[in-house]
Curated annotation (Swiss-Prot):
Gene3D superfamilies: Leucine Dehydrogenase, chain A, domain 1 (3.40.50.10860), NAD(P)-binding Rossmann-like Domain (3.40.50.720). The keyword Amino-acid biosynthesis applies. It comes from Campylobacter jejuni subsp. doylei (strain ATCC BAA-1458 / RM4099 / 269.97). PROSITE patterns: THF_DHG_CYH_1 (PS00766). Catalyzes the oxidation of 5,10-methylenetetrahydrofolate to 5,10-methenyltetrahydrofolate and then the hydrolysis of 5,10-methenyltetrahydrofolate to 10-formyltetrahydrofolate. The keyword ATP-binding does not apply. This is Bifunctional protein FolD. Pfam families: THF_DHG_CYH (PF00763), THF_DHG_CYH_C (PF02882). NCBIfam families: PRK10792.1, PRK14166.1, PRK14186.1, PRK14191.1.
Length: 282
């Protein structure tokens, strides 16, 4: 069994991005990511701090806009519009979730696609579905693909099962795997017999937010397992969606939680931001 070490790979990517940023600075461009946080969700605050720290590590300027819980939808749209027209800002990220009185889809669609480094804008989703690399790809699925590529895992002809059908992970993940030549099945909470799919899979990607959803009796020998889930137990321990201790015994490759997919998600956000800055140079 080989661990798919996202922490080590993300560190390597950050070093490469640091060099690219030094080149951009020599051309008068400083990569810049604007992050908007609405309210005081503790988890969101932690995520925003980690993103700002990661930016600092590889030479990206970060601007954090922390708005209060009562910020109106129009006020948020006005800020995004200002950032859309600010040439010194190359990436805009709105930290989710948003308060109930704000329409998430409207907000995400208001970010100009050329600064949508999260890859959620309909234009970028369209590029992905057409198999084009013109836009920005969603960070978590992109991080998974980079991780598999780094370990020279050939996806052509692989039977892949994705558990979770969200617009953030499951759906774009399915499209990326299809584009890479895999045969893809997408399962979700209404799937009748999950094991029927997982036992035949060469690759399983779990992104459902459910502790121990994937167990040893549900996988075959030699399976490749990518655990996107992040769950906090009452003890405070962070675990994924996979029964790691048992499933790892049957796996050829598996991601740990933490230090698997999480660091890669942030690395891809940084990579997309630098890509946007480079596009400005071109």
């Amino acid at each position: 069994m080989t661990l798919l070490d996202g922490k080590a790979l993300s560190a390597k990517i950050k070093e490469e991005l640091k060099e690219k940023n030094q080149f951009l600075k020599s051309k008068g461009i400083e990569s810049c990511l604007a992050v908007i946080l609405v309210g005081n969700n503790p988890a969101s605050q932690t995520y925003v701090k980690s993103k700002a720290k990661a930016c600092e590590e590889c030479g990206i300027k970060s601007l954090v806009y922390h708005l209060n819980e009562n910020t109106t939808q129009n006020e948020l749209l006005a800020l995004i519009n200002t950032l859309n027209h600010d040439d010194s800002v190359h990436g805009i990220l709105v930290q989710l979730p948003l308060p109930d009185h704000i329409c998430k889809d409207l907000i995400l669609e208001s970010i100009i696609s050329s600064k949508d480094v999260d890859g959620f804008h309909p234009i970028n989703v369209g590029y992905l579905n057409l198999g084009l690399e013109s836009g920005f790809l969603p960070c978590t699925p992109l991080g998974v693909m980079k991780l598999l590529k780094a370990y020279e895992i050939d996806l052509k002809g692989k039977d892949a099962v994705i558990i979770g059908a969200s617009n953030i992970v499951g759906r774009p993940m399915a499209t990326m795997l299809l584009n890479a030549g895999a045969t893809v099945s997408v399962c979700h909470i209404k799937t009748k017999d999950l094991s029927l799919y997982t036992r035949q899979a060469d690759l399983i990607i779990v992104a459902a937010g459910c502790v121990n959803l994937l167990r040893s009796d549900m996988v075959k020998e030699g399976v490749i397992v990518v655990d996107v889930g992040i769950n906090r137990l009452e003890s405070g321990k962070i675990v994924g969606d996979v029964d790691f201790e048992e499933v790892s015994k049957k796996s050829s490759y598996i991601t740990p939680v933490p230090c698997g997919v999480g660091p890669m998600t942030i690395a891809m956000l940084l990579e997309n931001t630098v890509k946007s800055a480079k596009n400005r140079l071109n």
